[in-house]
């Protein structure tokens, strides 16, 4: 449905070309410092208006906090935030109504709901929905930082086939990458990736990418041993983001090609506590956190809407046809989508930390 979480529960609403998208966040502890400037900074991270092919719609991300915050502090009641859609242009979509775009969710929505869905801009299946997740993620990140001192960040390791050349980066390197034109730690890769984006746009095409989410050290004990594993909940949350095609934790699929003697993280003492020497597993064992940073990578497919002729079916005439999308579209969803993955990570961590008793109901200072 449209909600995720057990105690810290996030519900998003709204369509791409409706009046607004928004989120209701329940289970927020009282006493968390939170203000509009901070939320605005988080929302602005997804704009990329300085690279027009990444965001031709370029919404201002004007938002309104309706409830749950007073005098810069959370009140413990549900927080409701709406982000207004001011630059949607729907006429492009009238020509392709009942002609599902290859690679998009149009066909799946039609087969499930018939004509009872808002197809404009992809409706709920649009990347625009993720702005609500990022607003909720901003709240979640503030909670994590102010209670258990955990930070979450993300970056792109590949965009349009252009990969970063470094693997010796730190969490701070990743966090600072958002000060660059693209969230990549490698300046040379950024320059090449921008050229790839522009070339793809010129050719009426699109590109995919791979991103990575990292945290600082997460307290041990988040997650349950079997069906409520932290790893499983993270995977579910991230795979719900539009355009996501895969996820791998730590070294992921590389571990499948190793022997156990290579793959196993040796356990050592550090400051009197058992720790992993290498963290190849990405910060979790048995699906639970173990005091290490959490790390995973996510693959995003190319944007389905492209300006090249594609074969489809006219669902009213029941005939094969071709369509060429003439509207605005992001050449790649990856830069915005990895930010949504960062937000979903924070949301899941807060939910599990509250359930584990690490975050109290009321923060008294």
Swiss-Prot record:
NCBIfam families: aroC, PRK05382.1. Pathway: Metabolic intermediate biosynthesis; chorismate biosynthesis; chorismate from D-erythrose 4-phosphate and phosphoenolpyruvate: step 7/7. One of its GO terms (cellular component) is cytosol. Reduced FMN (FMNH(2)). This reaction introduces a second double bond into the aromatic ring system. InterPro entries: Chorismate_synth, Chorismate_synth_AroC_sf, Chorismate_synthase_CS. It holds the Pfam family Chorismate_synt. The keyword Phosphoprotein does not apply. GO terms for biological process: amino acid biosynthetic process; aromatic amino acid family biosynthetic process; chorismate biosynthetic process. CDD domains: Chorismate_synthase. This is Chorismate synthase. Its EC number is 4.2.3.5. One of its GO terms (molecular function) is chorismate synthase activity. Keywords: Amino-acid biosynthesis, Aromatic amino acid biosynthesis, FAD, Flavoprotein, FMN, Lyase, NADP.
């Amino acid at each position: 449905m449209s909600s995720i979480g057990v105690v810290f529960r996030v519900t998003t609403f709204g369509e791409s070309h409706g009046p607004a998208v928004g989120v209701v966040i329940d289970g927020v502890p009282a006493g968390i410092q939170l203000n509009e400037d901070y939320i605005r900074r988080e929302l602005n991270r997804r704009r990329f208006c300085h690279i027009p092919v990444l965001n031709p719609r370029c919404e201002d991300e004007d938002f309104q906090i309706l409830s749950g915050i007073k005098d810069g502090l959370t009140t413990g009641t549900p927080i409701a935030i709406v982000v207004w859609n001011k630059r949607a242009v729907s006429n492009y979509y009238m020509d392709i109504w009942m002609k599902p775009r290859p690679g998009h969710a149009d066909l799946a929505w039609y087969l499930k709901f018939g004509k009872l869905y808002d197809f404009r801009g992809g409706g709920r299946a649009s990347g625009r929905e993720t702005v609500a997740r990022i607003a909720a993620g901003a709240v979640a990140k503030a909670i994590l930082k102010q209670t258990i001192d955990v930070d979450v960040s993300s970056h792109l390791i590949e965009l349009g086939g252009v990969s970063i050349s470094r693997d010796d980066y730190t969490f701070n390197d990743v966090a600072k990458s958002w000060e660059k034109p693209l969230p990549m730690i490698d300046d040379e890769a950024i320059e090449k990736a921008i050229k790839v984006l522009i070339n793809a746009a010129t050719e009426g095409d699109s590109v995919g990418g791979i991103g990575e989410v990292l945290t600082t050290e997460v307290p041990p004990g988040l997650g349950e041993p079997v069906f409520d594993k932290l790893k499983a909940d993270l995977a579910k949350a991230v795979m719900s983001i539009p355009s996501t095609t895969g996820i791998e934790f730590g070294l992921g699929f590389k571990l499948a090609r190793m022997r156990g003697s290579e793959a196993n993280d040796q356990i050592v003492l550090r400051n009197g506590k058992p720790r992993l020497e290498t963290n190849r597993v990405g910060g979790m064992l048995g699906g639970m956190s173990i005091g290490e940073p959490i790390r995973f990578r996510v693959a995003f497919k190319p944007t389905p809407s492209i300006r090249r002729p594609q074969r489809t079916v006219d669902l009213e005439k029941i005939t094969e046809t071709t369509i060429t999308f003439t509207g605005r579209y992001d050449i790649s969803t990856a830069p915005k989508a990895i930010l949504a993955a960062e937000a979903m990570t924070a949301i899941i961590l807060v939910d599990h930390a509250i359930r584990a008793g690490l975050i109290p109901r009321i923060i008294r200072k």
